[in-house]
Amino acid sequence: MKLLQMNHVQKSFNDDTLHVLKDISLSVEKGEVVAIIGPSGSGKSTLLRCAALLTDMDDGELFYGDIQAARSENGRAVYAGKETLKRVREKFGLVFQSFNLFPHYSVLKNLTDPQIRVLGRDKETAQQRARQLLEKMGLSDKEGAYP
């Protein structure tokens, strides 16, 4: 089963003068490990940002399993509704090469804040999920620590 499918993705910057992604297609199957390799400025991060719904594509299709998050219509990407995108964001994320934690937030707050702001979860649900993840990683004793 395809977990991620991107078809004919296009992305430009600077009023369409800088074409970063030109007709890029890829799929990721369940259990598959994929590496995106290329020189600096080749569009790797832009592609991942489009896949994670952090940057809008100019054109193309985007599927997460059987959920269509974006479709191509008249040469432009048209995104699904808010609720559909919210479901997708719950299942897909990425960690940047130089990610940053908020040094003035505890470990627990660093884990709960994105869930509340991005996923719209209530504080109690976000904290419960964060504690599950900390326990899974053997870091339960660090929830009150600061980075």
Give, region by region, the residue ranges found by the protein language model.
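The feature captures the beta-strand-to-loop junction immediately N-terminal to the Walker
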Residues: 37-39
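ABC ATPase NBD Q-loop/coupling interface
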Residues: 61-87
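Conserved ABC ATPase "signature" region
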Residues: 67-76, 123-142
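Short coil-to-helix segment of the ABC ATPase nucleotide-binding domain corresponding to the Q-loop/switch region
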Residues: 105-114, 146
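Helix-to-loop junction immediately C-terminal to a conserved catalytic motif
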Residues: 52
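Conserved post-Walker A/P-loop segment of ABC ATPase nucleotide-binding domains
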Residues: 55-64, 121
